[in-house]
């Protein structure tokens, strides 16, 4: 059932286990949906434009999110120039966003990241507390009642000082205004592996967790910076480490650490309960982020019954209409983000990968080898045709963002077809002296060279189509 916008959680109304008007209760949360759930504009790179933010607010309402967290890393007044007031034109834009959020029943949460140069102690610390309160006061007058102060991605690890700063700002803000809602933070050690060693809190996390008031909601990113899935057991360990229920800043579909690949899959399986808040960090390409964000909304509304694959298929159908089948074939090859420290998102092209593995294990005379060959050929052709249609029919703004990946999909599909033909030609060497086999091998090598030349700008289906083509090229 899609009319989730009529099911609004009664946050700020004193509901046990939810985000209360006076702060955040830290009792275990058993309710479904997740009480505070939404999108955090928290990526590095070019921030969203006003039109994109207005669009995402409407999207939040339609999909059942109830919060948008403003925290663009490359907004200078959010981070480097955090003490300075916003220029009038930017302040007008923020005011328009706050007004639009209220119209959409979406909570606008305003965040500042002062950690690069904030003073936490002494007179300078007092001055910076007043600077932060002044910054928040301007936004409060625009209608903002929910705030955040983040200390992520900085070198200094003064846990006690940060906790004191947060406590003072939260307390003074609430004393000034009785209608302040949530007050959130992200610590400097913001994922589980960095918070502890052998299950024992590291000094920073120990000081921060011990000193922080329980009316400040802590967000963390899970087991790693970008590592999925996240189990209930893993969340329970993090909660126990902090002695409170932690909220989740989930780094998918954000791809600012590997922009050559788009995150077009569903959100990984996540905990089924005891989560007070969740925010999904998107890509800088707002429109293409919506597939994953819609699945995140499905999870946040009903964690117990979230089905990633089903949610993903339904999101694509809703968003792409007559192009849904084509988009699903393309997006299937662009779901998982993986490097030496990140591993998040479901596997790329699982059907293609499984069929390719079966084919190479059994070719040429094993059971089902010929059927696998025919199936893989059909899959390659379908992906080429789908990418071709999308190149012609996608909306211009989306096409601009994913053209390199679509073109790489066409290259990979063509190379897959050549690889399949090469497998057949290898069985006919006795008949033609290997002429066709040599010709196809040369063609495949040229196609692989073209694929490699474009990997610096576009990655897709690396461990499915890409792996199959390379495996066949090495095969003798």
Task: Report residues per predicted region.
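Aromatic-lined carbohydrate-binding surfaces of glycoside hydrolases
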Residues: 37-218
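Hydrophobic alpha-helical scaffolding
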Residues: 87, 122, 159, 228, ...
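C-terminal functional modules
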Residues: 304-476
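Mature N-terminal, pre-catalytic/accessory segment of carbohydrate-active enzymes
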Residues: 2-8, 14, 19, 23-74, ...
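Conserved short hydrophobic patches within well-ordered secondary structure
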Residues: 139, 149, 296, 413-416
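Catalytic-core regions of glycoside hydrolase
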Residues: 42-43, 154-313
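A diffuse structural propensity rather than consistent per-protein peaks
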Residues: 49, 87, 230-231, 368
